[in-house]
Amino acid sequence: KTHEKKIVSLAGRILSLRKMGKASFFHLQDSMGKIQIFIKKDDVGESEYENFQLLDIGDFVGIEGDVFKTKVGEISVKVKSMTILCKSIRPLPIVKEKEDEVYDAFTSKEMRYRNRHLDLIVNPQVRETFFKRTKIISSIRYFLDNLGFLEVETPVLQPIYGGANARPFTTYHNALDQQFYLRIADELYLKRLIVGGIDRVYEISKDFRNEGMDRNHNPEFTMLEFYWAYADYEDNMELVEKMIRSVSKQVDSEKINWDGNEIDLTKKFKRIPFFKLLNEKLGEDISQLDINKLKKLCIANNLSIKKNENYGQ
């Protein structure tokens, strides 16, 4: 709107087309959004308009023209010149729009997961997730850096894995003639830095666990670990609460919906001892139960257990 009546140059992918004789409309999209484009044969010439008639959804073009507002109030660009930048060899899923309603959208989960690039093109809410994730990571770094934490990088290939109870991925180092493991956690190396005198450290890194996978668990995942000398668990709880509140504010998500419930992240987090909460929910003092009674309790609450599970597990 601030560019109305100004000449602008734009480039992007054609996302929709409405060809109508001597004048046509199309939507041009880049990573930041989309805008309506108006092209008229009398403005660009017969040759250039004939080239436009050959375009399809998915093609990339560059245009130069005047910004204006249509009768219905939509900001658009009237083309003075157009350049074809790249031809799309394969057709895109066509998302149709009419009177603010969307139909024939690319919504099949199976197709979306197998074609994530198409999902990003035609579903803007998916693309927004990528931008929001990057902003979350940046906000976490900003928060910890301002508290004096030092971001570090620890080895991904480790001769001895540890820091968690998980099965590792294994690989072989030919030069050293030795088996190595992809890290399952950063803990041990970060603690060495604490021992070495760096009192506040953190790492946001890829970790790998060679175990089952579902929509909530992936063998390759990103994890934040931080360690803080001279601080106890109360200090850490306070820090995590402040960090979540700070990050949620930065990404405009102070109130979120989870499983049908609204969660207000601006409010003080409830704190309750773990065993106290379990005892309240189960109606028993689990610290007084032997291993057999604990197993029966797990089965009664639909928790799968193995025959050799011990008390700690």
What is each PLM-predicted segment?
Residues K1-Q313:
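Class II aminoacyl-tRNA synthetase catalytic cores and aaRS-like
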